[in-house]
Amino acid sequence: MKLCGVLLLSLCCFAGISHAAQINLATLTCVRYQNEIMAPPVPAPGADAINTMMWLFGYSVGKSGAHVMYGDALAGFGFALDAECKNNPAMSLLDALATIKPDNKKPMDLTGLECETFASRHLELQQSDRESADTIMMWLFGFAVAKTGSHLFDSSGLKDFEASLMADCKKNPGRNLFDELVAVKFSAAKN
């Protein structure tokens, strides 16, 4: 009997891990997002709620058509998404994201930042604070996925995206970061 319980628990953990690898924003309800992604009973190894939220934030901005990064708006975005999901638990996460309008204080226009400048700053940040560099890259990854028209979150694609973006910035140093994020080719999960 104990063996059956252990097997059942193991299967649930593996299901959570595989679910966390790819998330369909159009079919995931707010209540499932809050219970299974942001506060799972058994967290998936390597899961990072901040990076997931950062990806969603970048995705939301990219989907809105804006071409700016809001440096001080992550907390406000997270609280607004949480409130929207609590008020509308059956709403899809994709629809909830469309309702959130980030605080637009201190916007950084991505059309005003050259790839070369971004790439050198990113490399410096990787040396001093890898975690922060990854968090910023997650925002850019979410933004770029939104620009492809996909509505799938797959955190395993971050390294491929980062390598493609950095290689393209090396090839096109004078291109602005917004144009590069729209043009970069990476293996985005397909709808």
Where are each of the predicted segments found?
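Sec/Tat signal peptide C-region and signal peptidase I cleavage site
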Residues: 16-20
